[in-house]
Amino acid sequence: MDFSPDRETELFGVAPASAAVFVLRGGPGSEPHVGKSSNLRRRLQRLLGSPEGKSRKLNLRDRVREVEWTATGSDFESGLQLYKTLRREFPQTYSDRLRLRFAPLVKLILDNPYPRATVTTRISGRKSGAQYFGPFPTRVAAEKFANDSLDFFKMRRCTEDLNPDPAFPGCIYSEMKMCLAPCFKGCSDAEYAVEVGRVQEYFASGGQSLVREIEKMRDEASANLDFESAAALHIRLEKVREAMAQLPQIVRRLEDLNGLMIQPSAEKDSVALFKIAAGRICDPVGLNVASKSQSASPQVKPQSMEARINEVLAAVESPRLHSALEWMEHLALLKRWYYRTLKVGELFLTDNTGELPMRRVVRGVSCVFKGEKPVGDLSETAGDYWRFRAHEAGIGGE
């Protein structure tokens, strides 16, 4: 709305005393002021109200000609809206203003003749042959998981582009039989490709592929009365599970990072649903959770909450990101919320069939709407999550 000092009472009367992202615009050619606040009315009164004495506080009363705002229902929504607003208003400098910390990822470089894994915070163009797994809380956590996991395989750790030469002396990993040593033709290209495929499947399944492989070998050894080998395989299996226990639930192949985040809404009797598609955050949609007696007329057949959620999500379009940088920024916002010690809202990820756990989603909607703490369930720990996926795939435990 338009603003002038003599209209401050009108502005302060309509501005909500709740969270919002706002833009203050001055005359033509001037730079807008963008910010977020947990109480928009109070912030505008400080920025646009009559200054008290010789205060050094920022006051834009005589410069602002127009005020815009978007009400938000949660800190996560405020952060997302602030990101979009700054990106629109300052396309060249918004990243410096936001200072987002990009999410650490495990990158499997598949377009190299001899693929390898590394840890990065950068995503290459979509045409590259790399696969990414994450987001991890820190680079140290990503490196530890990658190193502990690669100990179970014989894929190379070196970073050089290889030109295989039988005269090459190799490295400590080849000496310890922890690498197939393609650098000096210690294996054929086909053998190395098979090992890379095993690593790729391990990361994509959260370690379950290797668990199945070792369990099968252990059971075969026991059936053949080779109990010494079975015991060694069991110890190896426990080490794999220790590595898997490091894995937060949210860490997945980025293309499989799909789910639904539920946050409080600025709208009355509603929650905000944020669809997550391949780590990209869709615009929020409101879900009215008023009682049936309030929201449904006698002529309208009532819908279950599950059906209403599915109907709302079906109409949500995935965001069309124009660059890998935008993808990284969405992951940074998601990672920042997920790894907070104290956070508002709930996140539910899809299973290996692409389906949401709808019963838990419905319960989550109720908890967020009522402001209750999340109820502990399979989404709380990585170990339980991957055991759930193993159960769904028909994999028996010990």
Regions found by a protein language model. Give the residues of each.
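Conserved catalytic/ligand-binding micro-motifs in nucleotide and anionic cofactor chemistry
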Residues: M1-E398
